[in-house]
UniProtKB/Swiss-Prot annotation:
Required for the transposition of the insertion element. GO terms for biological process: DNA transposition. The keyword DNA-binding applies. GO terms for molecular function: DNA binding; transposase activity. It comes from the Bacteria. Keywords: DNA recombination, DNA-binding, Transposable element, Transposition. InterPro entries: Transp_IS110-like_N, Transpos_IS110. Pfam families: DEDD_Tnp_IS110 (PF01548). Belongs to the transposase IS1111A/IS1328/IS1533 family. This is Transposase for insertion sequence element IS1533. The keyword DNA-binding applies.
Amino acid sequence: MKRKVYVGMDVHKETIQIAYLTSNSKEILKEQQIKHNEVQIKKFIKKLKLEWNEIHCCYEAGVTGYPLYRYLKSLGVNCILLAPGKIPRQNTDKIKTDKRDAIKLARLMRSWRIGIDSCFPVEEDEAVRDYLRSRDSLRLDLGRNRQRLMKFLLRKDIKLLPTTKYWTVSHYKWLNNLHFNNEILQETFNDYYSRVRVQEENLKAMDKKIQEIAESEPYREKVGILRCFRGVDYLTAMFLLCEVNDFKPIQNGRFVHEFSWTCSWRIFQRFQKKTNRDYVKLEVPRLRRILTEAAWQHRFPGTGSKIITARRSGQPALVVALAEKASLRLHKKFRNLQPKRKKLLK
């Protein structure tokens, strides 16, 4: 019986393109396509186990999620789930087919040029992450419906007073008192307005549920530590925990930049030219937005507000010191990035 076989998989909704090779042979042993269901996968793995002792599989993370990964693990197969940004790509590699992708993954896995596999969440953490992403989608839908409502009013030449801000108590009073002589226009306005109100209530309910999850185990301690930092509350802390999932590989801020692509475009171009690799920002857009919004709170120097002091009560002194150090550093960075104003000559 032979020892090792390396299997590259290009996974789709209905099918899986497979290519596998051994450590001794440079040629692909076999290529085939199977249906994406447990019966066909189990049959394929059982056939491989009759010929090889060790089976190493890998596939690229995508919209199919983690069920295939968990199922292969349950069959006793060593499976690696790869993040798309971790796969090395050549500038000359312009042709992309299922067959070529499967062969490339198998060869990369055999030569161990794929690095570490992406950290995947357990089913409970994945459920919380999906709930957070659903909340983010609701936030975007609410913003779109608010725009539709205001554009509808603008088309009818109904404008808000310049002194009144949008979506405040006075704005809602103004909307409640709006009436149209045309019955169809009134129904249209009611439809737009009711969507906004319903989604606002749903958003508040989801925020309340997220806070309850954050205050329960196993998130309570980690959320409490993250809330010591300015700009981080329950929602931001839960997004960080669920999107990053594992903070152990993170050694410094540069790793976070590479993971979330929060660096500037100039640094990105310099890094791309140095490594001669093409990167696309397609992994964690929500994490980039959350980190940017949190960092934006450090425009002003920290004055030790009552809210931050209450969050830090009961937390380790080392965490509080690091949070204060980070706040001062980010504020200093913001001040250095500001354009220098020339003094006016008298």
